[in-house]
Amino acid sequence: MPKKIRVLVIDDSALVRQILSKGLALDPSIEVVGTAGDPYIARDKIVKLQPDVLTLDVEMPRMDGVDFLRRLMPQYPLPVVMVSSLTQKGKQITLDSLDAGAVDFVSKPTSDIARGLKAMLSELCAKVKLASTANVSHWKAARTVVPARLKTLEKRALAESTDKVIAIGASTGGTEAIRKIIAQFPATMPGVVIVQHMPAGFTRLFAERLNQLCAMEVKEAATGDRIMPGRVLIGPGGFHMKVVRSGGFYQVRCEPGPPVKGHCPSVDVMMHSVAKHVGGNAIGVMLTGMGSDGAEGMRAMREAGARNLAQDEASCVVFGMPKVAYEMGGAHSLVSLDSMAPRIVDLLSERRI
């Protein structure tokens, strides 16, 4: 019989702890080994109960979830799924939590509580099971500093790259990976389009946060936005983002639609459009994430002449999307996260005969 996933539920509300515990216990592969009302109690129970995964409330008294994560992860890295409110403050703290090492998050329902609660618990069970397979070992000890922007490569990279498009897809663990890569790009980098699996409301905050950290302009995409050097467009949650050609330039179209491979926005949708309209002028990048979204689109990009990279297993939180993309022939090579930005710049500067 397979070993059950041992979960510790951390929330300051006794009612929420009870609801989450009962919901998780309905899954035969999950065992709730304990609950904690605040991070101080949680710290002791982590040592005593040795859980495989934590669920953690975003906003708590005494110490919020982010501060707890920042203290926990360097000493005792564990996969953590955040339970978030959809308030503006809750969204901000959720993104802080992902930066601090949380694997994923679920949002508490705000309307139609009965139906919303059932959906949230189902999502929580799925994400706890995914989190149990996540690689969080790189959080052990001191966190690495984001490398300096690649200023010395800037002039060389620009030689033949003014009409290039860089298309990046990511899911679980992707926010941190994207930040590390984009923060190294110079302001004159070719246009970048990104699909990160994330609900509506979170993508705008994610873009705003990246915009404060990066030399490039970063914004949540809207239909009609031009793809141009120095700009990064993040696909909005709840909309598929497609790249189209309009005269002499590229722009994006953001449209609602059914989930593709379970996601909206979908990496496949974006990459298929890049294959069709950008072809050999594109570079594709597949980062950490569960599942296979983007693998077919990346293969189409390669067949259209694009050069593609996928994140390697050792640096992924979840080696799913990059693995499938590489195995299906979409990615030319597997690259570590630390080497990804320099490798992209190298590809931009290569002459193609």
UniProtKB/Swiss-Prot annotation:
Localization per record: Cytoplasm
Q: What class of enzyme is it?
A: hydrolase
Report the principal subcellular site.
cytoplasm
Catalyzed chemical reaction(s): [protein]-L-glutamate 5-O-methyl ester + H2O = L-glutamyl-[protein] + methanol + H(+); L-glutaminyl-[protein] + H2O = L-glutamyl-[protein] + NH4(+)
Active-site residues (renumbered): 171, 197, 293
Q: Name one GO cellular component term.
A: cytoplasm
What are the 4-aspartylphosphate sites (modified residues) in this protein? 57
The post-translation modification note in this UniProt entry reads: Phosphorylated by CheA. Phosphorylation of the N-terminal regulatory domain activates the methylesterase activity.
Q: Name one GO biological process term.
A: chemotaxis
Repeat listed as a keyword: no
- Keywords from the UniProt entry: Chemotaxis, Cytoplasm, Hydrolase, Phosphoprotein
**Which residues are in the CheB-type methylesterase domain?**
159-351
Segments spanning the bilayer are none
Q: Which cysteines are joined by disulfide bonds?
A: none
**One of the record's GO molecular function terms:** protein-glutamine glutaminase activity
Q: What is its EC number?
A: 3.1.1.61, 3.5.1.44
Per UniProt, residues of the Response regulatory domain are 6-123
Q: Which family does it belong to?
A: Belongs to the CheB family.
Write out the function statement from the record. Answer: Involved in chemotaxis. Part of a chemotaxis signal transduction system that modulates chemotaxis in response to various stimuli. Catalyzes the demethylation of specific methylglutamate residues introduced into the chemoreceptors (methyl-accepting chemotaxis proteins or MCP) by CheR. Also mediates the irreversible deamidation of specific glutamine residues to glutamic acid.
Domain note: Contains a C-terminal catalytic domain, and an N-terminal region which modulates catalytic activity.
> What name does UniProt use for this protein?
Protein-glutamate methylesterase/protein-glutamine glutaminase
According to its UniProt entry, this protein's organism is: Syntrophotalea carbinolica (strain DSM 2380 / NBRC 103641 / GraBd1)
Q: Which gene encodes it?
A: cheB
